[in-house]
A protein has these predicted regions:
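Structural preference for beta-strand elements that scaffold enzyme active sites
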Residues: 34-36, 61-65, 85-91, 156-160, ...
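Acidic (Asp/Glu)-rich catalytic clusters
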Residues: 25-27, 52-58, 75-87, 104-117, ...
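Active-site gating loops and adjacent loop-to-helix segments of metal-dependent hydrolytic enzymes
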Residues: 103-129, 264-267
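Bacterial N-terminal signal peptides
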Residues: 5-16
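A short alpha/beta connector and helix-capping loop motif
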Residues: 47-71
Length: 313
């Protein structure tokens, strides 16, 4: 019996890295259920920033992604720099969806003319970006956003895409892949089942071949029936999570006049904030199931370690 732990360790060490799950490579068990709860649209407005900070500090949120072109980006960067243990990624932006609250590119306008509507803002909808813009313009703009965040002192932990612009069409997915490789960052990724349903089964393997890491599953298919449905839908959806790493996202908000003036979704965003920050029931559900909440930082650090090792002769 005394020799069993040593034998187990030896067997563990000879298992090829490729045969291990991402959870195992992070030091967890293959059967563990790990959950990333990401706050999207942070930096969009002051209310969103304050809601995200509250949820990160005393709620269930484990990471957030920032909208660099938006007016309240400097505020959340200042918080991130003062709180380096928090995980902040970039919510890459090529659209500006609200009617009276708009934003445009970080890159020079003459480098991304196809991303601009007649008023000089980003287009409102993803299909408009595909119809008017080009993947090269999307790459230029996304790169400018990442570089601006780095120049501001943000320790970026991951990437995702606002309104999915970089996550649907193959040419834009390749832009997403290029950025992940260039800046050595993990990414939000659709599930294998979703890619297969869309007729694009090879993308997860292509990112993995470049050493890019991403969660095992991504939940993005909830359809709310108003703010009253938010809690019950998440309680059902987060029951019996699969082993491995699952990512979900929310848009945390509070019922301020600012948010009400920006979007008609303010009540749903407020309900998401309450469910994931102040309501004890969802927290208790996750605890009963043994779900472990994690952020993107350990995934990023593992990715960089593995890619650095692979690059050495």
């Amino acid at each position: 019996m005394p020799r069993l732990p040593s034998l187990f360790l030896a067997l563990f060490l000879i298992v090829p890295v490729q045969a291990q799950t991402l959870a195992e490579r992070l030091g967890f068990l293959a059967a563990d259920k790990l959950l990333i709860i990401n706050g999207d649209d942070v930096g969009m407005c002051h209310t969103g920033n304050q809601a995200a900070i509250a949820s990160l500090e005393r709620g269930l949120m484990t990471s957030a992604t920032l909208m660099v072109p938006c007016p309240w980006f400097p505020e959340i960067v200042a918080y991130a720099k003062a709180n380096p243990v928090r995980d902040f990624g970039i919510h890459l932006v090529q659209t500006s969806e609200w009617k009276t609250y708009r934003w445009g590119p970080v890159a020079p306008w003459d480098q991304v003319p196809g991303l601009l509507d007649p008023e000089g803002y980003f287009w409102s909808e993803t299909p408009q970006v595909y119809a008017k813009g080009t993947p090269q313009e999307a790459l230029i703009e996304a790169r400018a956003q990442i570089r601006k965040a780095l120049a501001a002192g943000l320790d970026i932990t991951h990437l995702d895409s606002h309104m999915g612009v970089l996550q649907y069409l193959p040419a834009y997915l390749d832009v997403y892949r290029q950025l992940a490789v260039e800046f050595d960052l993990p990414v939000r990724m659709a599930s294998q089942a979703a890619f297969e349903a869309g007729g694009q089964p090879s993308w997860r393997a292509r990112f993995a071949a470049d050493g890019i890491l991403f969660p095992d599953d991504f939940v993005h298919d909830l359809k709310y029936e108003g703010p009253a449905s938010v809690k019950s839908l998440w309680m059902r959806r987060l029951t019996d999570l699969k082993p491995g790493i699952t990512e979900i996202y929310i848009h945390a908000g509070q019922p301020t006049e600012e948010l009400k003036a920006i979007t008609g979704s303010w009540a749903v965003r407020s309900a998401e904030f309450e469910t994931f920050t102040n309501d004890p029931d969802l927290r208790a559900l996750l605890e009963r199931q043994g779900v472990k909440r994690i952020g993107y930082r350990p995934i990023r650090d593992l990715q960089r370690s593995l890619r650095n090792s692979r690059a050495k002769p």
